[in-house]
Regions:
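N-terminal membrane-anchoring alpha-helices
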Residues: 1-19
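Soluble catalytic domains of membrane acyltransferases
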Residues: 16-141
Length: 141
């Protein structure tokens, strides 16, 4: 409840203050249950925009975000999956195991940014191989 409310309120305030707006289309194409969503990451707003539209989102995120007071604690409380980007193969195995465990407990919608970080619109893509491994190992759409 709290993340969905916070997300909707933040997006509404951003629209009112900055005069932006958002147009969400294609929600009817999302499957039921667990699945992988791999969008481009272009701003902070990308991370919160999905909460109102997914049943139980599960983010894979950089470990450093868990160090932010209160925010980091809440990330862990929501059972998101922090990744240590220093050791790629070890980190990937840990992420696959943690994601598999979370999806076995409850159908969750995995959100992972396949480039690993924010990139400006129009920048050349730099996709990481982890998304392919997750898709193969988890067996979800």
């Amino acid at each position: 409840f709290v993340p969905k409310f916070w997300s909707r309120t933040s997006m509404w305030l951003y629209d009112k203050i900055a005069g932006t707006g958002s147009d969400i289309t294609g929600l009817e194409n999302l499957p039921e249950g667990s699945f992988i969503l791999a969008p481009k990451h272009q701003s902070f707003w990308d991370a919160i925009a999905f909460f109102p539209f997914l049943q139980d989102p599960l983010y894979i995120l950089k470990r450093e975000l868990t160090w932010i007071p209160f925010f980091g604690w809440y990330i862990l409380k929501m059972r998101m999956i922090p990744v240590d980007r220093g050791s790629r193969s070890k980190a990937l195995k840990a992420v696959v195991a943690a994601t598999r465990q979370e999806m076995a407990r409850n159908p969750r919608q995995l959100i992972i940014y396949p480039e690993g970080t924010r990139r400006a619109p129009g920048d050349e893509p730099a996709y990481k191989y982890g998304i392919v491994e997750l898709y193969v190992q988890l067996g979800v759409p």
